[in-house]
Curated annotation (Swiss-Prot):
It is found in: Cell membrane. GO terms for biological process: aerobic respiration. Pfam families: NADHdh (PF00146). One of its GO terms (cellular component) is plasma membrane. Belongs to the complex I subunit 1 family. It comes from the Bacteria. Its main location: membrane. Its EC number is 7.1.1.-. This is NADH-quinone oxidoreductase subunit H. It comes from Rickettsia africae (strain ESF-5). It catalyses: a quinone + NADH + 5 H(+)(in) = a quinol + NAD(+) + 4 H(+)(out). Keywords: Cell membrane, Membrane, NAD, Quinone, Translocase, Transmembrane, Transmembrane helix, Ubiquinone.
Length: 339
């Protein structure tokens, strides 16, 4: 009996504990990312931001959570009630399960699979389904228009993201995220320099993927009265909100893994190796999240035609050209990795 426990049940308990160890801190990070956003934007606009609930306003996310928890969930009369309830759950769950393959430090990853890149691309692509279902199930023209915009926007920028990741795969020769980080430890500086423009394109593309300014067309308040989640209240709205910010942290972690060396120190200096890799990972993700907030505070929203033109007429040709350029340079310099 004891052998059966250690062979079948104990591994499941360990996996469950790992999931809890990732999920609970992530939800806390999402809650306080909203606080950080309001404080940072407040400072940039010469005001104080939240400062009443608790010392320095630190209890504001808890107050917001309690408020949303006790609000009445209102379901529109002519909506598809089952899909209306499922849509925010789908969005929130997909924003969490992408973390299964992200390496936080050397050996610290929930599932170190050989096709981690394909897994995370698939999960990031599926997140649009929650938004489309919400727009259709709400039976509202504003919500439906926001959902259509979101699907068109994500399809447009998913292509560029995929091509950018191909350039990373060409230089690293693996689909395993932990191995991609370790390859960057010994990667020549000129390859890093060659991938830098693709890192910028990738970051702009994930801005569009997460529907953040200047690409927040699916939830444009001035045009669509909040877009796809206009009919949601209470925990439905809260789950969409949590899903959006969890996706922000996830794509920042993806950018860190692909282009910033993940948990590796930023410079190849011996004493920097004494600092735990988890610290460097959190520092890099935090920097990218600050860039998200900085962009929101400073840039206006794109027009829809400008958004589509940037995706199809600028990023798509540029990333295609860069894939050819990177592969040609790697073949010419005999640096193409063996797979």
């Amino acid at each position: 009996m004891l052998e059966l426990f250690f062979e079948y049940i104990f591994p499941l308990i360990i996996i469950a504990l790992k999931v809890v160890a990732i999920t609970i801190p992530l939800i806390l990070c999402v809650a306080y990312l909203t606080y950080a956003e309001r404080r940072v934007i407040g400072l940039m606009q010469l005001r104080r931001g939240p400062n009443v609930v608790g010392p320095f306003g630190l209890l504001q996310p808890i107050a917001d959570a309690v408020k949303l928890l006790f609000k009445e969930p209102i379901i529109p009369t002519n909506s598809d009630k089952i899909l209306f309830i499922l849509a925010p759950m789908i969005t929130f769950i997909l924003s969490l399960i992408g973390w299964a393959v992200i390496p936080f430090a050397k050996g610290v990853v929930l599932a170190d699979i050989n096709v981690g890149v394909l897994y995370i691309l698939a999960i990031s692509s599926l997140s649009v389904y929650g938004i489309i279902i919400a727009g259709w199930a709400s039976n509202s023209k504003y919500a439906f228009l926001g959902a259509i915009r979101s699907s068109a926007q994500m399809i447009s920028y998913e292509v560029s993201m995929g091509l950018v990741i191909i350039t990373v795969l060409l230089t690293t020769g693996t689909l395993n995220l932990s191995e991609i980080i370790e390859v960057q430890r010994t990667m020549p500086w000129w390859i890093d320099l060659m991938l830098l423009p693709m890192g910028v394109v990738f970051f702009i593309s994930v801005l569009a993927e997460t529907n953040r300014l200047p690409f927040d067309l699916p939830e444009a308040e001035s045009e669509l009265v909040a877009g796809y989640n206009v009919e949601y209240s209470s925990m439905g709205f809260a789950l969409f909100f949590l899903g959006e910010y969890a996706n922000m942290i996830l794509v920042s972690a993806m950018t860190t893994t692909f282009f910033l060396g993940g948990y590796l120190p930023p410079f190849n200096i011996s004493w920097l190796d004494c600092i735990p890799g988890f610290f460097w990972f959190v520092f890099k993700v935090g920097f990218l999240l600050f860039c998200f907030l900085w962009i929101r505070a400073t840039l206006p929203r794109y027009r829809y035609d400008q958004l589509m033109r940037l995706g199809w007429k600028v990023f798509l040709p540029l990333t295609l050209f860069w894939v050819v350029l990177v592969s040609s340079v790697l073949v010419y310099t005999d640096n193409l990795p063996s797979i």
